[in-house]
Amino acid sequence: MRILKFSILLFYSTFLAKAQSNLKLTDYYNNPSSYNPAYVGVTEGLFIKGYYTSQWTDFEGSPSSQMIDLQNNFDNRNIAAGISILNDTFGILENLNVDTNFSLNFKSSQDISFSLGLKAGINSFSTDYQSLNILDRSELIFNENISKIIPVIGVGFYTHGKNWFLGISSPNIIENKISTESDEVLFKNTNQYFSTFGYNFYLDNFLFKNQFLAQIIEGIPISYIFSTKVIFKNYVSLSLHYQPQYLTGGEIGVYLPGNLKISYGMDISNTVGISKYDNNHRFSISFQIFKGKSNWSDRQEFDKPYIVR
């Protein structure tokens, strides 16, 4: 029973961590709209991206995430909107997040723009203890499957010039909690904040994109990650990233005709005592349609370095 209790505690510890920040920082910096709704006003036309990440791939029920992100910048209206759907699974735990993002876009000068964003959605948490092979179900927690829906309201600010960008956001400002029928608190939401800054420069046919992303959660040490991406024209990209004390990783992306981009990335844990099974793999595919143009263009990330694809 002590081993069983420890296993359940481990599951819940991971669940709470994922509930507090659905994705890893590497996944966040690849998907800015997941933490900053103001970003949806940056892209042009219609943008669609699919994203998949998995961890501990040799274990049944290992953590995995699937996300679909859609953004549309309406012509000549300074308004953009989008929707993102994120599904997290880890063994008996499932977290479904559905967000709508809205932004108002302004130009303060010819080269500098900024956006104000609002995020609204729901987060659904559920567990299925019946799928566990538990011999002794006498403890109440084993008899209570959890199914809760909590609201999500977030805000964000994003500004950029030709070769730099800066963003500040909070993806959920509502404090809420998840409890069992016996009033045991399993999860209490604490506001989290994100800050990002990037500076980019060209060297012949290469674009170097450098980004810093920090995540601040009350009562938890600040998490931050550094990344550098090199894009050769708009044919191929290679990026490296480092999160101190936690992970090192990289990603390669290929730009295809028809404004398609396919990427594969991997993270390797730097934590002492963590095995190779903690490696994280991710795949993504995206495409973009530019309105008012007869031909699609796959050059936006190279020509506009504040864009993340």
Enumerate the predicted regions with their spans:
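Sec-dependent signal peptide recognition
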Residues: R2-L9
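Sec/Tat signal peptide C-region and signal peptidase I cleavage site
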Residues: F15-A19
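Subset of outer-membrane beta-barrel
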Residues: Q20-R309
